[in-house]
Amino acid sequence: MHPTIKTMLDVVAKGDEDAIKDLLAEDVKFKPPTYYKTWTGRDPVAAVLGHVGHVFSDFKYRRIMGEGVNWACEFECKIGTLDAVGVDLITLGNTGLIDRFEVVMRPYKSVGALREAMNQRVMRDARFLGFKDALS
């Protein structure tokens, strides 16, 4: 397993924004499961993923598939009292850092709960005023 993926498996669920940031390429692109937009840049993506780590509970990776630069990491978690499953689709760049990170999840009700919880957290985080240009 690639060292970046191995480390990611340990830090994402903890919401450790600094540790997550160390795994991201400068121009990383992140596609969340809650809307069809893309976050671009190490700082905003680390901030989003840091918040996710605090919204999810009982998070664990179930299966890891991939080799080289392309990886799929299947997970399960809770959002409040709702169960969810998802997959992190990750592409590593030439430097071995995460260049592209896309999350797909189900069921729909859990994704809605994630969106609501994330909106509440992001609205209270003043850094996101500066990150508005990172969303396209």
Feature names for model-found ranges:
Residues 1-23:
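Short acidic-aromatic low-complexity motifs
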Residues 4-7, 19, 44, 110-113, ...:
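Exposed alpha-helical structural elements
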Residues 17-19, 23-68:
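A solvent-exposed, acidic/Ser-Thr-rich amphipathic alpha-helical stretch
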